Amino acid sequence: MQTFLNLNSFDTEILYSLENDTAIQSLEKKVKYLIIYGPNKSGKTTIAKKFSTNNNIDLTNSVPHELNFNKETYLDLNTLPGQDENFFHFLQYFVTNNIPLTIFTSENSIDNLNDEFYLPDVVSRLKQFTLCNIHNPKKDLLFKLINKYLSFKSISVSEQIIIEVLNHIERTYLSAFEAANTINHLLYENNHNINLSLIRKH
């Protein structure tokens, strides 16, 4: 029986690319106060988990009220609580105590980095951070991403199939994610058979 591809399965493999090169280099150089931001499914959480594990860095997914951090920390939070006074105290704690902090977040959080969406004190603190963007994927990375998602369930299709899929999707990480899911469903619906004609019709 076909097992549907679980695209939310935990993944520890970082796909190194030109799109995330600046972010990776900034982490390797240990930029003291850093914000890494990027589109949905761009690998921010995977990078945060991998680097935190390899370098014994604390990783948190929330802004705690009790602040007892004593070493370099990663905050992985897709939506920053810009109107929360506690978030200001969180940022201030790291700056005052000279503790390195890297924030992984969404493009929207940075696009809206102004006094309309954030407390002025929060904006002031975040502007002390170095901004580093993970860019949308180009064709080569899209190909690798689709292949990677399929490999999670040991699904293999010809290069021609993936290349054809690339002609019909947007250049986003989420599109690669959804394309792999579509390929998996087409395989299921067509008794494990898939061809270029089927892709074009879909």
Over which residues does each language-model region extend?
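A short, basic N-terminal segment
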Residues: 1-29, 188-202
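Conserved AAA+ ATPase "sensor/coupling" helix adjacent to the nucleotide-binding pocket
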Residues: 120-121, 129, 140-155
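Conserved AAA+ ATPase "SRH/arginine-finger" region at the nucleotide-binding site
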Residues: 112-114, 129-141
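Short regulatory helix/loop adjacent to the ATP-binding pocket of P-loop NTPases
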Residues: 110-127
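Short conserved motifs of the RecA-like P-loop NTPase core
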Residues: 156-169
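Walker A/P-loop nucleotide-binding motif
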Residues: 32-47
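Conserved P-loop NTPase "ATPase switch" module shared by AAA+ and STAND
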Residues: 62-93, 97, 101-109
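The conserved phosphate-sensing helix
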Residues: 169-181
